Amino acid sequence: MTILGEYALWIALPVSVWGMLLGYVGGRTQRGDYVLSAERTIYAVFFLLVLASLGVVSAFLGDKFEYWYVASYSNREMEIFYKITGLWAGQRGSLLFWAVILAFFSTLCVFLNRKKNREFMPYVAGVLQTILTFFLIVLLFADVNPFEQLAFTPANGQGLNPQLQNYWMTIHPPTLYLGFTAFTIPFAFAVAALLNGRLDARWIELTHRWILLSWLFLAVGIIFGMRWAYEELGWGGYWFWDPVENASLLPWLTATAFLHSIQIQEKRGMLKVWNMSLVLLTFLLTIFATFLTRSGLIESVHSFAQELKIAYIFLGFMGGVLLACILLIIYRLPKLQSENSMQSFLSRESAFLFNNLMLLGFAFAVFWGTIFPLVAEGVTGEKISVGPPFFEKVNFPIGLVLLVLAGIGPVIAWRRATKRNLQKNFQIPISVGLFVAVSLWMAGARHGLALVTWSVCAFVLTVIATEFWKGTQARARIEGEGYAVALFHLVTRNRRRWGGYIVHVGIVMIYFAFAGAAYNVDERQHMLPGDQVDITSPFGHTYTLTYEGLSVSLGRGQRNLLWQAIATVSVEQDGVAKGILTTEKRQYVTSDQLMTEVGIRSTVREDLYLILSAMDDVDGALSANSAAQGIDLQVLVKPFVAWIWYGGLILALGTVIALWPSVDRRRRSTRPELEAVTTSAPAMAGAAR
């Protein structure tokens, strides 16, 4: 199977090149047979890449250490599950995995459009095959072929990084890859529109769900990565502004901007050049994320890179795509003129445009902070780093403005908002926000940034709740339905709008959790068995932690484990027993680095987070006297962290609702009173239109 996979990878390249040529020539000559053949080559490339992927997995399962990739990321002791996920554990396999997902989405796109939208499909097939060809060239000629063999066969492999042997890391990278590759479809349709000259909103209509799908996978993938960092890395946080973390955030930010700005083109026929530029930028940032992870130019705990040849190939590809698309946009400028103009600063168009500027400002700050160490080293020859303080200082005010816009955008009028519109829609939400601010201040909340954030969260939630209430009440009155039934029908009759509101709720929940970090408690204690320490929560209650002792297992119970030391801590809250937490140090056979496993007690209100920072005597801990060992214990109390994960679920739910096709418009009520209440389009600060 492995040999078959290697042959399949080599065959895929000429097939892809042939399909690329057929697509462009078919679009130019309008030859239907050429177009059909181009589409069939996409099916063929997908099949061949699946065979190649199965070949790599077969090599992992068969412990074929004659292959460099298998020897580098597996060993005989590794569990079968992690051998299968070894396909995307390293640079070579992850590039192949990327290509096979891209081929899958390309196949799905061609299949769904086999009998419609034929004016776009020749060039769509050509663009998709161009990108597939690029990845195949990288795999075969950039020293990253997963089927490369060693000069000798080692007795065993090096094994997978223990930090990657975690369930979150088995789903975090694939989810991000799904998000990155799914955005290739909107990009392909945008380029097809530039090539065939159909530059109305049709290409946006055809790709809207693809954009949402990509946005959803990126958002969920980022949250999965945050969860992995929180549970596995053992430093007490979930986001460190690591270069590769930033690289995954960048296309999500620009895709969010794109989801807002396309509404202006759909509604008013404006921002056509802007939208073309945003779809190009977002696609390039998905490639940039791949480049950054695999080029070796910037150090990261996530980076797979070993060779720099791949960096130059990626840079050349991105430069070529950028130049070609800019030339196409310039060529089509006469057809990309706006049909209307901005009539007032106080309008939904202005709110969306300002939202775009803030998102792009956020993205630029992240991008510049990420690449600045590389630029500075190239200019001065000295290595520097840009840490979390820079990103947080620059991006917090931008993020707060975006949160405010999440409350303004959904209800402000198109074209020009009147004084009555502003008063009607914002008087109650602003009052609620101010009331929350005063109440929190009187309750003792004195951290200014957190106080402002929570007040704005209350403002946005009130806007959304008011919209749901007005729509439900109107439908219940007009259709004679109960409120629960009316709410259900309200959402299902316009999933795109109300799904967007639900996404807003998820975003607000995540902001709420982020603001809670202002009240984190962080204490470190040296403890001997039997010692107790009291930790006061930001909410006023007291945790009493008792260190019960250290237990050591020498390679028992888990493959590839040399030893593990488990510190047991009993937890009481205001004198009431709350259970036992454990935190560990682990030493793996294939790694000299000690790994930390944290203990977490999570509630809706706060997380109690324990880290075994150090043991008094590691050698002594491995002896019979391990139970008497002293430890350094780091204790953190982190308010509202669970709301990040809850917010992620709500965000995903809202996006799925927005993705789902709405009920046929012919089945909707056409009563003017109901339509007036329920058909205004929403803004989505987090994503769903």
What are the language-model segments listed below?
Residues 1-689:
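Solvent-exposed, non-transmembrane regions of integral membrane proteins
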